[in-house]
């Protein structure tokens, strides 16, 4: 499972002209399920994401997590993160989880996130979304948890 997280001053998702999710300062997270991912990978990725120290403390060091700062988390489904770009000029999405599996894992991830953190907003799985954000830094990290084979 993949999470591309960006520290933001604010972020929002619009679907069909309506804002479906928005946060102030926090993390905007593009989330992707890969083939073979299960709730185990989702749990591990969520634990890492919520405790990942990307916010500055009083000394200016990245020592605080989104939980420590009570920041928002905007979770946006993004299957293209699993693209295989090694060959040619058209990406292959074979590494991405099947849509029904990906939807179930995204919904599970959101449910678990809401049980562990107060400020969770989401995009809409399968929708054409317009995502807006103001990067803070910019600070961007790629987190990935692979199934143990």
Curated annotation (Swiss-Prot):
Family: Belongs to the DTD family.
CDD domains, per the entry: Dtyr_deacylase
Record's keyword annotation contains Cytoplasm: yes
Chain location of the short sequence motif Gly-cisPro motif, important for rejection of L-amino acids per the record: 137-138
Protein's job: An aminoacyl-tRNA editing enzyme that deacylates mischarged D-aminoacyl-tRNAs. Also deacylates mischarged glycyl-tRNA(Ala), protecting cells against glycine mischarging by AlaRS. Acts via tRNA-based rather than protein-based catalysis; rejects L-amino acids rather than detecting D-amino acids in the active site. By recycling D-aminoacyl-tRNA to D-amino acids and free tRNA molecules, this enzyme counteracts the toxicity associated with the formation of D-aminoacyl-tRNA entities in vivo and helps enforce protein L-homochirality.
SUPFAM superfamilies membership: DTD-like
Subunit structure comment from the entry: Homodimer.
Membrane-traversing stretches: none
Catalysed reaction, written as an equation: glycyl-tRNA(Ala) + H2O = tRNA(Ala) + glycine + H(+); a D-aminoacyl-tRNA + H2O = a tRNA + a D-alpha-amino acid + H(+)
Organism: Janthinobacterium sp. (strain Marseille)
Coiled-coil residue windows: none
GO cellular component: cytoplasm
Alphabetical list of InterPro entries matching this protein: Daa-tRNA_deacyls_DTD (IPR003732), DTD-like_sf (IPR023509)
Description of its domains: A Gly-cisPro motif from one monomer fits into the active site of the other monomer to allow specific chiral rejection of L-amino acids.
Annotated protein name in UniProt: D-aminoacyl-tRNA deacylase
Superkingdom of the organism of origin: Bacteria
